[in-house]
Amino acid sequence: MFGKYEQNFNAHKPLSTIAKFKYGTMPKKDKLGTGHYHAFSGYQIVGTYPEVMFENPQLIIVARGVGGCGDVKYTPANCYLTNLSIAIITEKTMHDDYLYHYLRLHDTKIMNTGSAQPQITVATLEKFEIPIPPEEEMIRFSDFVQPFKQQYRNNHDENKLLSKLRDTLVSKLMSGELDVSDIDI
C-alpha cells in the first residue's frame, strides 16, 4: 500500500496535514501512585494517576530518551500520558491506522534533534513529510487492519488477565492456601 506513494513526491505532505500533536505532561509527584488511571511514559506504565488524558488507546511517539525515542505505539486505554511522549491525534480512525503502520515501517529516529539526549519535538513532527494516499485507499487499508488490531488488543487483555490469575494461584499454592495434591493429571 505504501510503496506506490513513496516515489510520488506530489503525494508527500507534512504530517500536520492529517494530525495534530499534544505533549504528554509531567505528572505531579504527590498524585503519582494515586487514582485509577494508568500513568504511561511511552515506554511503560509507571504507576497510577487520578486524572485521565485519553480514554481510548492513543497513537503516540516516544519523544525523549536513548532507549526508544522515535518508537511509535499505542497507549493503554484510560491513561495519563507523561512528558516523555507526544500524542499523534487524528480525527479519523483510517488516518490513525495508516500513520501507525507507515511510521512503524520507517525510520522515525531521523527526527531526533537532541544532542545530549535524543528528543523529538512537535515542530519536527508537524513538518515531517510523508506520502498521503487518497482517502479511499486509507479507508480500504483501515478496514483491512481493524480486525487484526482488535485481535491484538483482545490477546493483550487476555494475557494480562492470565498473568494476574497465575500470580494469584502461585501465591496461594506457595502459602498452602490452595492444595492441588489430590488432582490427577
Task: Kindly label every feature range from the protein language model.
Residues 11-133, 184:
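DNA target-recognition domains and sequence-specific DNA-contacting regions of bacterial/archaeal
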Residues 1-41, 131-180:
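Non-catalytic DNA-recognition/assembly elements of restriction-modification systems
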